[in-house]
């Protein structure tokens, strides 16, 4: 039989204050600092909105990490807190005890709410915010500096989530007093006019990750370019399934030139991902030459590129230190792979991930990339499935990986000799050929996680993943 621990005196004191909201409100200014967190959590869990409104006005810490306490925003709770902040921001003389500089609506730091009471006697909590956002990303702190509200935003639908809509309206009405800082912004299906409205409210210099999906490239470039130019702290930029409906190559070139000029301002960019790359076919160099910062991650996927596009990849210093290169499902079977081989040689000392899945590379092209690939000593992940390889070409490829001792996950296609007229695997032929390939590989090194053939495996259902220790079908 377990004995439940008696409530702490602090908990009892907080519960006593909350029984009479008028008493708790009048006591806020003189409330001991050590009581503030437990009392706030109690008021929050019981939804004592009036108490929350007053508590936020005398908040004794620099940050209120509400997002880690409220996983999903609750409209009435949000209104209560913002009402308290409104009353505070409109006062000429702010309370002596008030220290709040950041309202954080992200799920950042659960430890904040678990460390009371002792740790808070000396803490003013600047640490959590600095881990996710540096001081240069948002306006400088100081007396009567704008209050910063941090939130990660995902725009999925119209009408918008009512909490987000209320927050946008609240911030817009207090321009100059509040900055809405969004470190990560994702736009799924929201029409471009609503995305523009959001960008007019968000403090653009705070955005570190931006993902835009399912938009027209011409409209995106014309309507959003002016906003992208102001995102000077952008680290990750993703365009997914953005399409185009023009066959005018000259017009495309002008649009790409306008779009590329944006990158002259993005001095901190580390990741660039474009899914459906065809819009840039024949114009990729315009974009690459405008990159100011050496990228760590480049993903250009789905579609096709010309040989001139591939050549530019090895010619600019911004791509000289890549750690991750993904060209999956970019059709490469009609062009020379010598430029790709030159790029691999250039980035051999830094490259950790190489994804050439589904590029329809023919075994006659393979020799162009093998010297560069064999020098990628830091490579841990190599995806080469869904390419057109003979058994001899695959053996040659595997032998060239002998020096890749850090390789921990790799995929290869079934040799073409094992495919039937419908380009499906004939398992009677494939099984001994796969054993032959594994024997060739084990002669030069011991693999860790390897897939040869179709994925997911029809025999065991497994797919490439970091969790899979061994593909038993090999």
UniProtKB/Swiss-Prot annotation:
Name a biological process GO annotation: positive regulation of cell population proliferation
Arranged from A to Z, the UniProt key words for this protein are:
Leucine-rich repeat, Repeat
Q: Does the keyword Repeat apply?
A: yes
Q: Which GO terms describe its molecular function?
A: ubiquitin-like ligase-substrate adaptor activity
- GO-annotated cellular components: Cul2-RING ubiquitin ligase complex; cytoplasm
Repeat LRR: residue ranges?
A: 97-124, 179-203, 204-230, 231-265, 266-291, 292-323, 324-342, 348-375, 376-400
So what family is this one in? Belongs to the PRAME family.
Q: What is this protein called?
A: PRAME family member 1
Q: Which organism is it from?
A: Homo sapiens (Human)
């Amino acid at each position: 039989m377990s004995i439940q621990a008696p409530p702490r005196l602090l908990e009892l004191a907080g519960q006593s204050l909350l029984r009479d909201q008028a008493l708790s409100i009048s006591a806020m200014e003189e409330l001991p600092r050590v009581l503030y967190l437990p009392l706030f959590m109690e008021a929050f869990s019981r939804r004592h909105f009036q108490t929350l409104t007053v508590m936020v006005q005398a908040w004794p810490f620099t940050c209120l990490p509400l997002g880690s306490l409220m996983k999903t925003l609750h409209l009435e709770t949000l209104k209560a807190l913002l009402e308290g902040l409104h009353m505070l921001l409109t006062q000429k003389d702010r309370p002596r005890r008030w220290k709040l500089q950041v309202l954080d609506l992200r799920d950042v730091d659960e430890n904040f709410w678990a460390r009371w009471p002792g740790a808070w006697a000396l803490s003013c909590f600047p640490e959590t915010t600095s881990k996710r956002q540096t001081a240069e990303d948002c306006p400088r702190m100081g007396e009567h500096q704008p209050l910063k509200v941090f939130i990660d935003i995902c725009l999925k639908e119209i009408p918008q989530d009512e909490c987000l809509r209320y927050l946008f309206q609240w911030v817009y009405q207090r321009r100059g007093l509040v900055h809405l800082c969004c470190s990560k912004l994702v736009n799924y299906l929201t029409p471009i006019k609503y995305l523009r409205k959001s960008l007019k409210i968000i403090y653009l210099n705070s955005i570190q990750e931006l993902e835009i999906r399912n938009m027209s490239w011409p409209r995106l470039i014309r309507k959003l370019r002016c906003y992208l130019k102001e995102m000077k702290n952008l680290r990750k930029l993703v365009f997914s399934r953005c399409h185009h409906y023009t066959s005018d190559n000259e017009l495309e070139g002008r649009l790409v030139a306008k779009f590329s000029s944006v990158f002259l301002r993005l001095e901190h960019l580390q990741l660039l991902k474009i899914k459906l790359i065809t819009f840039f076919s024949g114009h990729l160099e315009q974009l690459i030459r405008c990159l100011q910062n050496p990228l760590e991650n480049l993903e250009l996927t789905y579609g096709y590129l010309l040989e001139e596009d591939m050549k530019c990849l090895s010619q600019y210093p911004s791509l000289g230190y890549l750690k991750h290169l993904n060209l999956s499902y970019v059709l490469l079977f009609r062009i020379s792979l010598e430029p790709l081989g030159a790029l691999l040689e250039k980035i051999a000392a830094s490259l950790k991930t190489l994804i050439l899945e589904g590029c329809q590379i023919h075994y006659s092209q393979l020799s162009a990339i093998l010297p560069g690939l064999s020098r990628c000593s830091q490579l841990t992940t190599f995806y080469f499935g869904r390419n057109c390889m003979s058994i001899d070409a695959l053996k040659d490829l595997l032998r060239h990986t002998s020096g890749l001792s850090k390789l921990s996950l790799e995929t290869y296609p079934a040799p073409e000799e094992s495919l039937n007229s419908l380009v499906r695997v004939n398992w009677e032929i494939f099984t001994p050929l796969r054993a032959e390939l594994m024997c060739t590989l084990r002669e030069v090194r011991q693999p860790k996680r390897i897939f040869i053939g179709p994925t997911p495996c029809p025999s065991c259902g497994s797919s490439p993943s970091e969790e899979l220790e061994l593909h038993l079908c090999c």
